[in-house]
Amino acid sequence: MTVVIAGAGPTGLTLACELTRRGIACRVLDKAPDLFPGSRGKGLSPRTQEVFDDLGIAPAINSGGMAMPPFRIYAGHEVVAERSLVEMLGTDIPSGPGIPYPGFWLVPQWRTDEILLDRLRQFGGDVEFNCEVVGFTQRSDAVSVMVSQGGAPELLHASYLVGADGGRSTVRKMLGVGFAGETFERERTLIGDVRADGLEGSFCHVLTRDGQVSERFSLWNLPGSEHYQFVANMATEDVPALTLDAVQKLVVDRSGRDDIVLRDLRWISLYRVNARMVDRFRVGRVILAGDAAHVHSSAGGQGLNTSVQDAYNLGWKLAAVIYGAPEKLLDTYEEERMPVAASVLGLSTDLHHRNFAPAKGPAPQLHQMDITYRGCSLAVDDRVFQGNLRAGDRAPDALLDNGVRLFDVLRGTHFTLLTFGAQAPVIADVCIQQMTPSPDYDVTATTLVLVRPDGYIGVMTESGRTVLEYLARVV
């Protein structure tokens, strides 16, 4: 036994896929009887779509979803506006030859989880449901994990324990790390999946009485389903019962309409908005990822995306350490992901308080394509003349001279060394790819670019020795 993962949501499943495809044995435990049934985290960012492309599930994700629909805003029965996601949130979405997935993709979370679980099983893994972590102890070389499966206790011995068990993480609480931040006690968010009669077209239907979106009831079309996801924010004292009748009354109260009839309530949840983050992502051999490490408002759709990318950052590093890389490689997980989580916390909180009001400052960047690890210890750039692309940045896609996409070359568990005319050193288990400089790759012919397994640039240099020294630190 090598790794125990607590939690079979998008974070835990992504991490399990990353480990099992590298030959790392792991046990994925979840206290629920099955996968999460709701649509909750439904918007996949361009960067998350790239992660799923690398995992080999892009076709399933594409067929299971649709482009993010526009918002249709109603004042009673009248349609008063139709706006894109870009217009509603004041964001921008980059495009170009280096970006294969230029927009957000709408996939209900239950479907994303199903696709990830199917992929995990193809890699030889699985999930143990009705099984929860109830305690653990760790030594310098191992962690012992106490679990309860259907009431029966079991003691597991593992190299590492990863808490990917959500905002109420048992692993985090037992680990005893700080979880500072704020809770918005004066408000609640109601969310669920329901069928609705009386609506036409694929939109996010924003129901209001007078066109003012601050008091709204939203219904999102869900692809591949007859259900809608509904969302409504409210004061704590106005929370209704979690029943179909109460939600139906809320629709009438918010919209002034009785022609929209709800039925078949599949899932419903009421939650307090928190903006909190741990002060440590790892303590010894216990690691936190996703909502177990940071929670925030759903505004801007950053939660699932940030969590998946936590797992993607951690997976290759954890596997490398298990195979013999220096353990301090794991320190770079917190070094790189904690600033990202802090930034997302601030962004989502700002969007939450704005409540669709226009931004007063720069447009919020929701696509996550600009996340960079520049300045971190795994970003080495010793060139004298540096262009726009730097070590620590995401490696852009490109069309190669042979007609193949660069992302097709990067896909997999390996490092890739990009050359632009210079003689590349021969390195075992590193893919060598010849390229031509371009606006996205504004480099000289003597530049070497080493791309990490997670698609970020580890090295930009003109020295083969720099590449070899870097690899000695990470493999």
Swiss-Prot record:
Subcellular compartments: Cytoplasm
Record field: catalytic activity: a tetracycline + NADPH + O2 + H(+) = an 11a-hydroxytetracycline + NADP(+) + H2O; tetracycline + NADPH + O2 + H(+) = 11a-hydroxytetracycline + NADP(+) + H2O
Annotated knockout phenotype: Cells are about 2-fold more sensitive to tetracycline and doxycycline, but remain sensitive to tigecycline, a broad spectrum glycylcycline antibiotic.
GO cellular component: cytoplasm
Gene3D superfamilies in the cross-refs: 3.30.70.2450, 3.40.30.120, FAD/NAD(P)-binding domain
GO molecular function, one term: FAD binding
EC number(s) on file: 1.14.13.231
Record key words, sorted: Antibiotic resistance, Cytoplasm, FAD, Flavoprotein, Monooxygenase, NADP, Nucleotide-binding, Oxidoreductase
GO terms for biological process, alphabetical: response to antibiotic
Domain of life: Bacteria
Catalytic class of the enzyme: oxidoreductase
Regulation: Inhibited by anhydrotetracycline.
Cofactors required: FAD
InterPro entries, sorted: FAD-bd, FAD/NAD-bd_sf, RIFMO-like
Family annotation (Pfam families): FAD_binding_3
Family according to the record: Belongs to the aromatic-ring hydroxylase family.
Function: An FAD-requiring monooxygenase active on some tetracycline antibiotic derivatives, which leads to their inactivation. Hydroxylates carbon 11a of tetracycline and some analogs. Confers resistance to tetracycline and doxycycline via an oxidoreductase activity; probably monooxygenates the antibiotics. Does not act on tigecycline.
Classification via PANTHER family: BINDING MONOOXYGENASE, PUTATIVE (JCVI)-RELATED (PTHR43004:SF19), TRK SYSTEM POTASSIUM UPTAKE PROTEIN (PTHR43004)
Protein name: Flavin-dependent monooxygenase
Gene that encodes the chain: tetX
